[in-house]
């Protein structure tokens, strides 16, 4: 009887210990939650950005609640974030800037003039050397976009209109990578 009681007590203790779940994608561990300001965001999904069959970065989308509709994510004025970890030495600052510029062109249908100043600020965040293992957190909170590199905030600017174009790079009709889009939407 003592063994049964002790077993039940230990079992109850083991299951009451909090666990910090994580998700691994392409060798990169993404936490299942992320704190942005006062908000706790949950990992919606993640995937790998590929180009010419090479893995470039692992990306994860964090939202206040899970969502699979890409248009709702783009239009939403709620806190959200994209986490990226560079997994290839092929990504340089110049290549990242080119990809971002191309992404904004596609996301806005070529009409970048209303947000051009914010695009330039965003691009400036990628001017420093980029190397394998670098992390970027692009978050939207309290009406502004914030960019952090390796855990250090670089800049904060923009508004909802800019955020919509920015998230359109990953979730628009012509995303940077369709498989990454589906992964971050939780479909893969």
Task: For the regions a language model picked out, list residue spans one by one.
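Positively charged n-region of N-terminal signal peptides that target proteins for export
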Residues: 1-4
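Bacterial N-terminal signal peptides
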Residues: 7-16
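Terminal leader/tail segments of proteins
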Residues: 20-188
